[in-house]
């Protein structure tokens, strides 16, 4: 499971969906209050299981169980999605240039997905999020 996180990030880089240092992923086993998240600032093309940061969801917030590196700056977003969307077990945050271009062109991606069943059949299109400060709680809150 954790090995797949690095595989996903390498594949995302190969497809041009992220640069070597952006994008992040978190993954949680079914029924667990522990999830793993990519570290901040690491090159995503060389990330491996031992680099992942182990985080526990606790009632008062989060408990970082590994301190060998800083967790992703988007930890707030990952933890909210992992905590409040019970069916969510993986959060993949990428920056595909075609999606970013479509958003800046004013396209509503949810409408587009609803008009093309082949899109909604294979992926879940979340709401478009406005441009907000990176790693901010404001950005994390907008992902709901």
Task: Place the predicted regions along the sequence by residue.
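Glycine-rich flexible loops
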Residues: 1-144
């Amino acid at each position: 499971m954790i090995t797949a996180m690095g595989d996903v990030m390498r594949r995302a880089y190969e497809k041009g969906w992220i640069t070597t240092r952006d994008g992040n992923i978190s993954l949680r086993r079914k029924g667990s209050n522990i999830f793993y998240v990519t570290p901040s600032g690491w090159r995503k093309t060389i990330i491996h299981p031992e680099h992942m940061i182990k985080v526990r969801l606790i009632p008062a917030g989060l408990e970082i169980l590994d301190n060998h590196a800083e967790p992703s700056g988007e930890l707030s977003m990952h933890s909210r999605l992992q905590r409040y969307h019970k069916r969510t077990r993986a959060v993949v945050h990428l920056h595909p240039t075609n999606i970013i271009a479509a958003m800046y062109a004013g396209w509503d991606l949810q409408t587009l997905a609803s008009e093309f069943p082949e899109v909604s059949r294979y992926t879940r299109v979340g709401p478009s999020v406005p441009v907000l400060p990176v790693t901010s709680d404001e950005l994390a809150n907008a992902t709901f």
